[in-house]
Design a protein with these regions (language model features):
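Glycine/proline-enriched, intrinsically flexible loops and inter-domain linkers
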Residues: 1-194
Length: 194
């Protein structure tokens, strides 16, 4: 739908208003259980409101700044997310190679690394756009990357942090994925819901 509207607007000569769709190349973390205060709780992390936006007709897309459903959104401060959910942020950074290439590239997305802590029970779900590129460029540009999940349960991150040891904060490159250094039970996925 956004592609159709943008093509129609461009055909009428309003090229500054043309905007490609965004690919939602990040994940939404949601879940529930007993929070760090011992209370029943549920959370949907609205970092998703800070996706990269598609390329414009005359400019590159906007990096991790908004979402089409919430044009004034932002990812929020990690300290606030840590106050309302049993997540400890270990990293939030620009997701490499998440922008769609073209004459004008799409906006880059972000990635976060969380540690669930101070809870006896917490169920985590990931919501993302896996398996397909559903937002190609308007006039032949390539789509952004798809989302994937990489959950590591029963890991050694807490022990590493307490010792002051370095730990990887992103997957790294495909040949030598840095997160493989973390010991634990792994779950990979490209499903929309995991």
């Amino acid at each position: 739908f956004p592609r159709t509207i943008s093509r129609a607007v461009q055909a009428r000569g309003f090229i500054e208003e043309v905007l490609g769709a965004y690919s939602v190349s990040g994940n939404v973390l949601q879940g529930g259980g007993i929070d760090q205060y011992g209370e029943p709780s549920a959370i949907m992390n609205f970092e998703i409101a800070a996706q990269g936006l598609g390329a414009k007709y005359v400019l590159d897309g906007t990096d991790f700044a908004a979402a089409m459903f919430n044009p004034e959104g932002d990812a929020g401060d990690v300290e606030m997310w840590e106050l309302i959910s049993p997540f400890l942020y270990l990293s939030r950074r620009v997701k490499a190679s998440s922008a769609g290439p073209g004459r004008h590239r799409g906006g880059s997305s972000f990635e976060s690394l969380f540690l669930v802590h101070k809870t006896p029970m917490w169920e985590v779900q990931n919501l993302g756009t896996g398996r397909c590129f559903y937002s190609p460029g308007i006039f032949g540009g390539y789509p952004g990357s798809v989302a994937y999940i990489h959950n590591i349960r029963d890991n050694d991150l807490r022990e590493r942090a307490l010792r002051g040891d370095a730990y990887p904060v992103a997957d790294g490159d495909f040949e030598h994925p840095a997160l493989m250094e973390i010991q634990g039970e792994r779950e990979y996925g490209h499903d929309s819901f995991t």
